[in-house]
Amino acid sequence: NEQPGKFTTPAEVRIVRTLPGPVERVWDYLTDPEKRARWFAGGPMEPKKGGKMELFFHHKNIAPGETPPEKMKHVQDPGFKMPGTVLRWEPPHVLSYTFDEDSDVAFELTEQGKNVQLVLTHRARGKDLPFLHGYASGWHTHLAQLIAQLEGTPRPPFWPMHAKLKAEYEKLRASAPQS
């Protein structure tokens, strides 16, 4: 669960994780605003294809007492809202939605015995998304928070992990196959 994601192209990153199941529990952590806020971002989500949603990033809840980088302070507190639209709603296996103005994210869940394989794919809608490596490091860090939530273990420090991974993902993206 520590492996970095892979850039399938400079405009798409895929991260695979094995999570403790059952799949319905993992689905709840993706779709229930209160549970999602514990590891990623809260906010309402209409449970249907075409449904409206709003992610509310308020990282003081997942990184209490941590100091974020200057350009991310608004995410720590007071928080940041991102509207979106649900693209796929296939409980409890597939969730996809728009992310920011230029990209989409998809979560695919597959049962593997008592565990669940999560495949997260974040892709630019256009040809390129210059800051996709930042999104990739964010997803990697947020998924570490999700794993801790599901396992009932202490959360790793968010911002130090994010900073380290951002540099790693920038290198990985530079070596991605060209589309």
Segments predicted by a language model, with ranges:
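Hydrophobic ligand-binding cavity/cleft-lining segments
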Residues: N1-K48, S179
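A structural signal for short hydrophobic beta-strand segments in well-ordered beta-sheet cores
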Residues: K6, M45, V86, F107-L109
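Intrinsic-disorder/low-complexity, polar/charged segments enriched in Ser/Thr/Lys/Arg/Asp/Glu/Gln
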Residues: E12-V16, K52, G79-K81, V94, ...
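Beta-strand elements of well-folded, non-transmembrane domains
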Residues: G21, N61, A124-G126
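Conserved beta-strand residues within beta-sheet cores
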Residues: V23, K81-P83, A106
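Glycine-rich portal/gate segments that line the openings of hydrophobic small-molecule binding cavities
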Residues: M45-Y97
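Beta-strand/loop substructures that line and gate deep hydrophobic ligand-binding cavities in soluble
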Residues: R88, V94-A148
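A conserved amphipathic terminal alpha-helix motif
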Residues: A124-S179
